[in-house]
């Protein structure tokens, strides 16, 4: 039973991301490099957040009680802000690299920013999902019984679906965020930051899984629709894609912008 829970939750959480990687990234070495670079940027943001958290804990002398609750909230908010700052830094790096490539070899076609946004977002999402869910997933192999102290017996399942939504949100956030940077629409960046904060702070409502998941999935659907149109999608292109009649749909042959 524990093995079934482990593999079931693992495929729920990471199955869609794995499919995206296999079908849209794995065949192109350059995309793999950008994916790894995006994951690395997320790791550095986590490291910086951890350093701040450690320093604050030392300053407060590891006090218990309400102080720790406030520190936890502060830590989550700070971590989200740092992640978005590193997303911006990664965009700046990719933009400079793209411009440098064009200046060196004008005939070389650089990857479009839309494609880079998708790949970097998936890198952010996969690394975020791994760090947030792997420890929980390892506990599903046992020993122990979920819910023995009144916790929900659906804890692992809820965590898997929450990890899935966060991974997909990072993909959508990446596409929308990069588009906002390209068009200097700063309200777009603010929207990405605010929705990221909303999804992250929902973890403080952990006993109320229904509220968490419903809210997170509503945000995911809305961000997904936004990212779809930002990436150049339309109702017509979606119809052609679903009917397998569009071989040049969105990501495969994006022209450089």
UniProtKB/Swiss-Prot annotation:
Keyword annotations of the record: Membrane, Notch signaling pathway, Transmembrane, Transmembrane helix
Any one cellular-component term (Gene Ontology): Golgi membrane
GO biological process: amyloid precursor protein catabolic process; amyloid-beta formation; membrane protein ectodomain proteolysis; membrane protein intracellular domain proteolysis; Notch receptor processing; Notch signaling pathway; prepulse inhibition; protein processing
Function (record text): Probable subunit of the gamma-secretase complex, an endoprotease complex that catalyzes the intramembrane cleavage of integral proteins such as Notch receptors and APP (amyloid-beta precursor protein). It probably represents a stabilizing cofactor for the presenilin homodimer that promotes the formation of a stable complex. Probably present in a minority of gamma-secretase complexes compared to APH1A.
Family from the record: Belongs to the APH-1 family.
Subunit comment: Probable component of the gamma-secretase complex, a complex composed of a presenilin homodimer (PSEN1 or PSEN2), nicastrin (NCSTN), APH1 (APH1A or APH1B) and PEN2. Such minimal complex is sufficient for secretase activity, although other components may exist. Interacts with PSEN1 and PSEN2.
Protein name, per record: Gamma-secretase subunit APH-1B
Gene: Aph1b
């Amino acid at each position: 039973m524990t093995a079934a829970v482990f593999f079931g939750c693992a495929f729920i959480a990471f199955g869609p991301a794995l499919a995206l990687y296999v079908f849209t990234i794995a065949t192109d070495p350059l995309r793999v490099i950008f994916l790894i670079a995006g994951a690395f940027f997320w790791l550095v943001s986590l490291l910086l957040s951890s350093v701040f958290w450690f320093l604050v804990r030392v300053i407060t002398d590891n006090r218990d009680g309400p102080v720790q609750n406030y520190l936890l909230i502060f830590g989550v908010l700070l971590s989200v802000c740092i992640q978005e700052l590193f997303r911006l830094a990664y965009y700046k790096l990719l933009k400079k690299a793209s411009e440098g490539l064009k200046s060196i070899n004008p005939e070389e076609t650089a990857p479009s920013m839309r494609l880079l946004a998708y790949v970097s977002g998936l890198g952010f999402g996969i690394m975020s999902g791994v760090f947030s869910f792997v420890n929980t997933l390892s506990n599903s192999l046992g020993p122990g019984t979920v819910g023995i102290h009144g916790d929900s017996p659906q804890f692992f399942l809820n965590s898997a679906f929450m990890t899935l939504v966060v991974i997909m949100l990072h993909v959508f956030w990446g596409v929308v965020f990069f588009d906002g940077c390209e068009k200097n629409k700063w309200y777009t960046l603010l929207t990405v930051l605010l929705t990221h904060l909303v999804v992250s702070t929902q973890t403080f409502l952990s006993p109320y899984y229904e509220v968490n998941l419903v809210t997170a999935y509503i945000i995911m659907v809305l961000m997904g629709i936004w990212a779809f149109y930002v990436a150049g999608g339309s109702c017509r292109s979606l119809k052609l894609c679903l009917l397998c009649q569009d071989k040049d749909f969105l990501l495969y042959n994006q022209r450089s912008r």
